[in-house]
Amino acid sequence: MGDKTKVQVSKLKPGRYIIIDDEPCRIVNITVSSPGKHGSAKARIEAVGIFDGKVRSIVKPTSAEVDVPIIDKRTAQVIAVTPDTVQIMDMETYEMFEVPLDTGVEEEIKDKIKEGINVEYWETLGRIKIMRIKGEEE
């Protein structure tokens, strides 16, 4: 838990992940300005938080290194649903987790979460989020 690695800014692409303000984010857009007379090229990175959905942006030299989260994508079964939490059990380790319904579940699937279904969850930086329902053809 809490795993992250370093990656050079020039290697980042939209759709990948980055840590901004200690929050794992999915990169939405990268704009690179050409090097000027007195400086190196700079990249403006716009990203959306995985857990809070907030848009964040940073400007870094393309030669700089940034933290990238290591995201563990796993399958779990929903054991119980309460008004404010979802209890899930990992299908490999049989570990139990309590996930808050407001911040730990993707908006589109909140109303579809029910006991007994399998879900895909992401674990990164000590936090868990249920991303999608497994086995659902849409």
UniProtKB/Swiss-Prot annotation:
GO cellular component: a single term: cytoplasm
Classification via NCBIfam families: eIF_5A (TIGR00037), PRK03999.1 (NF003076)
HAMAP family: eIF_5A
Pfam families documented for this protein: eIF-5a (PF01287), IF5A-like_N (PF21485)
UniProt function note: Functions by promoting the formation of the first peptide bond.
Gene Ontology biological process terms, A to Z: positive regulation of translational elongation; positive regulation of translational termination
Main location: cytoplasm
Modified residues (Hypusine): 37
Protein name per its UniProtKB record: Translation initiation factor 5A
GO molecular function: ribosome binding; RNA binding; translation elongation factor activity; translation initiation factor activity
Keywords of the record: Cytoplasm, Hypusine, Initiation factor, Protein biosynthesis
The organism of origin for this protein: Pyrococcus furiosus (strain ATCC 43587 / DSM 3638 / JCM 8422 / Vc1)
Record SUPFAM superfamilies: Nucleic acid-binding proteins (SSF50249), Translation proteins SH3-like domain (SSF50104)
Listed InterPro entries: IF5A-like, IF5A-like_N, NA-bd_OB-fold, Rib_uL2_dom2, Trans_elong_IF5A_hypusine_site, Transl_elong_IF5A_arc, Transl_elong_IF5A_C, Translation_prot_SH3-like_sf
Family, per entry: Belongs to the eIF-5A family.
Subcellular location: Cytoplasm
Protein biosynthesis as UniProt keyword: yes
Origin superkingdom: Archaea
